[in-house]
Amino acid sequence: MKQKLCLHGLEVKHQAQLLNLVKRLQPSAIVKYKTKEKYFKDNDMYKCRVARFSQAAAPYLRVQCAWGVLLVCDKLLPVADITLEFDARVPEAVAEAERLVQRFLSSRLKFVLEEPSLSLRIDQLRGCFDQKELSAYDEEAAQSLLYCHLPWQVYYVNKLWAEVLAKGAERPLMRQLRVKLRRLRSLLTFCKPLLPEQEATEWQRVLKERTNLLGDVRECDVLLMTCAKLRDAQGEQAAEQLTAILQKRRVSAASKALKGQKLNKQTLELAKLLLWLYSAELTESSEQTLEKFLQQRFGSWYNKIIVLPEKYPDLHDMEQMHRIRIKLKRFRYALQSIPEVGAEPKLLRSLKYMQDMLGLLHDNYINNKLIEALVAKYPKISELRYESAMFTGWEQAKADAALEILPQQWETFEELLHDWKAKRL
């Protein structure tokens, strides 16, 4: 099967930068130039100059450079792309594609992975993207999940890495990056029966490792948000010492998380993930239709979720509650990433509410431990003990309220889940 992998250049000043990069790696290639333009409704359009490189010695792989603009919602966006088209069934083609990607990403130019089709890129920017429009989409093939659904999650992660590394460890960006990494890992877990188990497990480990890098920053952000609420409720002097300590801790955690991180390094890792997805030898499960695989896989996850209260009955055991939250979060991410299953907004809202309530309980549990550790670390700051007591009291009140309504919320969620299963599975 022919696959495409697109590297979108950031801050590329001239087309010659892209052309020279490719020419150095393919000096014997024949180059043909063509201008492409297409117009859409609402005055959207794209226009670009495309250079196609072809080599007789490697007919299974072609490279093209595109330079131009997209006009979307009256905004001009640059097109500065290097796209590789290769036969994923030919090992030599995949190996050569990986070699070229590594060489491109070792240059001074910065790249992110992007959707190769400019038309679909415009749809995505307008918020009307439909995965069924992708050429690789096939309702009769379960592997459509690998070629259509997973790549878009990869693109989101890569673009957020670009924003984080350009703008710094801003709280909203760090949170979004962590969420997108978790969503990518959840969808990969969902698709795991289609893939070689050992390699899929290794990629799960890699994505978990990347997510965990951001964990300390997230913990500090949660604590600082609670401190901000305390100040709003009780005045600017509330939790003053605790806030100062946490801000320093947050700076240190962010520096540690981003130390040594380079955009092209992240892009290369994610490009390798895509190349593996495109070329992996699939299991027998891939012979199912997409609908049958989705029914089977979501049915299996449904069966596991419905027995969670029996498996983890102790509402006061925060480790058990955390395990429930992880499974609910993974389920919600899969539902959101696969529109074919038609998850109703009510179900998604209920899932999110359950996840937030369980998250509040777990945050309270973790925060109490962190606050205790800070008090022990700074015994000479007398105000800290008072502020920590005020902090934990504030958090505990919210946790107690969440714990009280949790059984009722689970009943509501369970009803919605049953209804969804009856309609969709």
Specify the residue positions occupied by each region the protein language model found.
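Function-determining surface determinants
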Residues: M1-L425
